Amino acid sequence: LSTLKAAKNMRIKLLNYQRTFYSDALKEASQSKQKSIVFGNSKDPATAYRLAEILNRHKIQVHSLAKNSTVKGKRYAKEASYVVPLNQKKSKLIHAMFDTQTKFKDSLFYDISAWTFPLSFNVNYSFEKSIALAGSEIKTLAIADDKAIEQSSYAYLLEGHGYYTPKFLYTLLDAGIRIKVGLKPFSIEGNSYDYGSLMIPVSNQNMNSEMLHKKITEAASGLMLTIRSESTGLTEGIDLGSRNFETIKKPSVAVLVGDGVRSYDAGEIWHLMDTQYEIPVTKIDVRQLNRIDLNRYTHLIIPSYSGSLLNSSTKKIESWIKTGGSLVAYRDAIKWVNKSELAKVKLKSFKREATGISFDQKDNYRGAQNIGGAIFNTDIDRSHPINFGIEQSTLPIFRNSRIFMEADKQSYNNPIRYTKNPLLSGYISKEQINLLKGSVPFKHIRKGRGNIILLTDNTNFRAYWYGTNKVFANTLFYANFMR
């Protein structure tokens, strides 16, 4: 009631503010040197489309890219990129979505401190001083018609960059179709294929070539993937029949839920698999784990977890891993993995030694050490299976935890590593960023015939962090190739 009363008393002031907000925004935009934003990439139209979809939902004017372009060393394909003019009434909202901020008046936050959308989608973007790159305005945003896939007598090929590659891959695996992944780049008939490209051979399938073509075409519908038909296995680089192609097994995934498991993290994993990838997932309550036959599953995911209920299942989980299972542990679950001695991980610790902080400032000091949610840059090794399908050599990562894993002495065991100056957007204290520099958000540990995969950061945050969803998907399909 007090809020309504205050609004009534401020009625004229609020109405004036509402009336002038957009006109002031237009005036400010017209005077700015920044005239447009180009965003997108060269090989993943789906991710750029989903970002354009959000802009369109908020009635922000979006244009197509006039032609294939290279801007500041980054490639933008016409069919996978967009241009947003800044001289429009919602320019303030556009800036709120695309700007980065690393300096703040306060160090305490109610929620996360960074929302930068192009970083969360991991698309290239640039503020431009003209609208020269803009094509026609997109009045009705729609997914482009599927590209025709010619029937092949030898094999079908596609790169792994597309956002919906995991969905396509699982659909075919579920139909019993044999698929291989390329561990090294290669070229064939003038087309280059990156690490993690997929090959679907026509021979040795459980169906004839006509049915295989039909299944592939149906599975790819609406996913914005480029699939090519090849008639030969002779390539520049690795041959299609070489040992540098590994057969992918269909994952069977379980995720822990219940007491001790952070429900937000579990829900985000479930949402991603169910809504985006359409991969079935079994939710297992922590209290019921000892009654479950884990041999039914290839993967067990432990979202951020704290507590002691899992302790009674340690030997069961360890035995399952040793016989070929893959355990994926997120955030605080890493501490449980350490404590249970499933694996030994060196963690950096923060020594809280306050200097010059008075008693009445201690709460603010402690609060400032939290990482409520910020965006950080990493260098990645694109040849490692955890990074298959990621186009750039850097990857923005969302972090809202204070778990810092030491890098391995062997560089090839650090395929994702925080840079020397990692902060891209948001707040982090000097003490915490010193711990973050050079640490690693990912570790793969062999155990018997199985795998333990550790991730300090949430790759699926609030269903809009598209850029690192692929890291999670790669743990499902490529864990055995990380050994």
Show where each model-derived region lies.
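Intrinsic-disorder/low-complexity accessory segments
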Residues: 1-483
